[in-house]
Amino acid sequence: MKVKSFAKIDLGYSVYKKRKNITKHDFESIFILVESVYDDIEIIKIDKNVDDVHYYNETNEIYVYSRLVYKTLEWIRQTYRIKNHYRINIKKRIPIGAGLGGGSSNAAVIMKSILELEGIKEINYKDVVNKLGADIPFFLSGYKTAYVSDCGSTLEDLSGQFKLSYEVHLMNVNVNTKLVFEKFDDNQWHVIKNNFKTIIKNLKENIVTNIYNDLQEHCFELYPNIRYKYNELLREGFYTILSGAGSSFICIKLKDKENQVIHEN
């Protein structure tokens, strides 16, 4: 089975402080699938007692260790009592550490494909979030745009409800998401600025304003070169927001231009 594993961008990102005995941050965001940026994944049933995962660029095999992919394979096997094993070939195009959900997309596509091959249709999103990750349910959902909350397990389909013209600006920086969240946690004072009900209403009326990413300033503190690029994009006239923990930007522009992806060398 051959499948595409698409990237996503986060339009606005509100992060809530962790509550006692809760290991994950609750958040709100609008996730948008980016179908022009994707990894190619091939899934082959093999006659072995272990799974075999390989990563490639356009020409060669490369070393990438994704704990999430192996964790997903283990979760599938334990949850659904699957006995078959698989070789997974992943041709990487989604940049690593770019805030585009590449690892989660890979995990979701692998999960969905293997369950399809095994004839299994039911997936518990809350269990996926608790055991694997908050971005995975979006990639499982089939939605092109969604309002996401409840640690990623609750999704409201917004596909086709507004038209947004944007560029995705990819920087050649691998951001450490864990460090960005640690910076966020160290900050004692935090005010939620986004009102997603208003943001969604405005987007449907072609109004883009008052959209914030709570991780943006913490990313900039750790990576000053990303802040520099942000200021440069602002000077070019874009409404610019960091995607996730970084390093990619969503640059919103005039709606009569085509969406595109720009790579920073």
From Swiss-Prot:
<dbReference type="GO" id="GO:0050515">
    <property type="term" value="F:4-(cytidine 5'-diphospho)-2-C-methyl-D-erythritol kinase activity"/>
</dbReference>
<keyword id="KW-0547">Nucleotide-binding</keyword>
<dbReference type="GO" id="GO:0005524">
    <property type="term" value="F:ATP binding"/>
</dbReference>
<dbReference type="InterPro" id="IPR014721">
    <property type="entry name" value="Ribsml_uS5_D2-typ_fold_subgr"/>
</dbReference>
<dbReference type="InterPro" id="IPR020568">
    <property type="entry name" value="Ribosomal_Su5_D2-typ_SF"/>
</dbReference>
<comment type="pathway">
    <text>Isoprenoid biosynthesis; isopentenyl diphosphate biosynthesis via DXP pathway; isopentenyl diphosphate from 1-deoxy-D-xylulose 5-phosphate: step 3/6.</text>
</comment>
<comment type="function">
    <text>Catalyzes the phosphorylation of the position 2 hydroxy group of 4-diphosphocytidyl-2C-methyl-D-erythritol.</text>
</comment>
<dbReference type="InterPro" id="IPR006204">
    <property type="entry name" value="GHMP_kinase_N_dom"/>
</dbReference>
<dbReference type="GO" id="GO:0019288">
    <property type="term" value="P:isopentenyl diphosphate biosynthetic process, methylerythritol 4-phosphate pathway"/>
</dbReference>
<dbReference type="InterPro" id="IPR004424">
    <property type="entry name" value="IspE"/>
</dbReference>
<feature type="active site">
    <location>
        <position position="8"/>
    </location>
</feature>
<keyword id="KW-0067">ATP-binding</keyword>
<dbReference type="Pfam" id="PF00288">
    <property type="entry name" value="GHMP_kinases_N"/>
</dbReference>
<keyword id="KW-0414">Isoprene biosynthesis</keyword>
<comment type="similarity">
    <text>Belongs to the GHMP kinase family. IspE subfamily.</text>
</comment>
<keyword id="KW-0808">Transferase</keyword>
<keyword id="KW-0418">Kinase</keyword>
<protein>
    <recommendedName>
        <fullName>4-diphosphocytidyl-2-C-methyl-D-erythritol kinase</fullName>
        <ecNumber>2.7.1.148</ecNumber>
    </recommendedName>
</protein>
<feature type="binding site">
    <location>
        <begin position="95"/>
        <end position="105"/>
    </location>
    <ligand>
        <name>ATP</name>
    </ligand>
</feature>
<dbReference type="InterPro" id="IPR036554">
    <property type="entry name" value="GHMP_kinase_C_sf"/>
</dbReference>
<feature type="active site">
    <location>
        <position position="135"/>
    </location>
</feature>
<dbReference type="GO" id="GO:0016114">
    <property type="term" value="P:terpenoid biosynthetic process"/>
</dbReference>
